[in-house]
């Protein structure tokens, strides 16, 4: 049997970006922090994210027809922490604009992808949500926030010589 805590540590060796995924349901914004975001295809442009089915926000995302993935910048660690918690008060004082589909695009994000939801696949205690990108925004000058080994990090370029020394 696999020990959950050991598996979590091993999976934590994979560095990821940090996102806040948003949707709008019945005139209210819903959002949560996720690092389980990845591209699926460029044609058609498709992405996916995973969400725990026990999360309070899962019901909203299950019924939503669209969502936006906000890729957080390195200055948005507190935003990541805030959206990792439950409760409606997490939107208090948050600066955002609504995209063409009504979802929140967070001010200061490194990138944002507005998607029509294509499919939701429930697996174990999570759901995989696939979306087709309808529009995107990016600010290349913003450094993305990274999460690895249970810590926030900044990406750092590795020179060819340094990389060779590690292999």
Predicted regions mapped to residue ranges:
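Basic, polyanion-binding surface patches
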Residues: 1-167
């Amino acid at each position: 049997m696999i020990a959950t805590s050991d598996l979590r540590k091993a999976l934590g060796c994979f560095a990821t970006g940090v996102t806040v995924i948003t949707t709008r349901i019945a005139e209210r914004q819903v959002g949560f922090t996720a690092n389980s975001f990845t591209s699926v295809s460029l044609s058609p442009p498709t992405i996916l994210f995973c969400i725990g089915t026990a999360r309070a926000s899962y019901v909203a995302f299950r019924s939503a027809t669209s969502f936006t993935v906000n890729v957080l910048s390195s200055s948005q660690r507190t935003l990541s922490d805030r959206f990792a918690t439950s409760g409606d008060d997490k939107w208090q004082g948050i600066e955002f604009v609504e995209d063409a589909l009504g979802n929140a695009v967070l001010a200061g994000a490194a990138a944002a992808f507005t998607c029509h939801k294509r499919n939701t696949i429930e697996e174990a205690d999570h759901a995989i949500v696939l979306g087709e990108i309808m529009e995107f925004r990016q600010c290349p000058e913003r450094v993305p926030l990274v999460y690895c080994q249970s810590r926030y990090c900044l990406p750092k370029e590795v020179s060819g010589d340094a990389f060779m020394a590690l292999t």
